[in-house]
Amino acid sequence: MRFGSTAQEYTELLTPCNILPSFRYVYPYLKNKKILDVGSGTGEYLELFSHNSEGIDCSKKNLEVCRKKNLKVKLFDINGKLPYGEDRFEVIFCSHVLEHVESPINLLRECNRILVRKGILIVGLPTESTIVRRIYDHYFNSHPEHLYSFSIDGMNRLLEKTNFVVVDTKLDFALLHKFKLNLVEDFLQNFYKMLFGISNAYWIVARKK
């Protein structure tokens, strides 16, 4: 994974998709849990989690920023076996990471291995649809390191193959956030399959079988 040569570049690169306003939909699954943030970057999400949570990332620069925030982090290339034993975490948080790794299915298997029984996996992904590309062309053009693009159905199949069951799906609508239309976004979540193409990102919450 390569997000840029400096932590500042990483932060600038991920600003459009990092602390998504739609994070409020998945936060209840994270509250007061022992969490591993896979691809924790400069810790924007990690610092919102409980004190016994930790993160892993492949960038020394990013981890330096995390440590200045007193966050527990570890340097690791997540393309390999994760450096933890089985049944270690209650929740694994993986935001805008799977599209970058060499083998998404292997990472999902590793997440399953280190989750406790019925533990929760939260995956955040960009939506790379035609409509969104027209509106956010600058975003996608600045992300040549994306190796994969996932539809909701495609992601669901990967999760099923790696021993997860999907329990929730939420979309992120950037234009609605711009105009502070949170109630409209709440309503539109009921039609996520129909509206996937006009969202800019989405979350999937899955439980270990």
PLM regions and their residue ranges:
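S-adenosyl-L-methionine-dependent methyltransferase catalytic module, highlighting the catalytic core
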Residues: 2, 8, 12-21, 44, ...
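Basic phosphate/pyrophosphate-binding loop/patch that engages nucleotide-derived ligands
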Residues: 113
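A short His-aromatic
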Residues: 96-100
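Conserved N-terminal segment of class I S-adenosyl-L-methionine
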Residues: 1-85, 91-95, 108, 169-172, ...
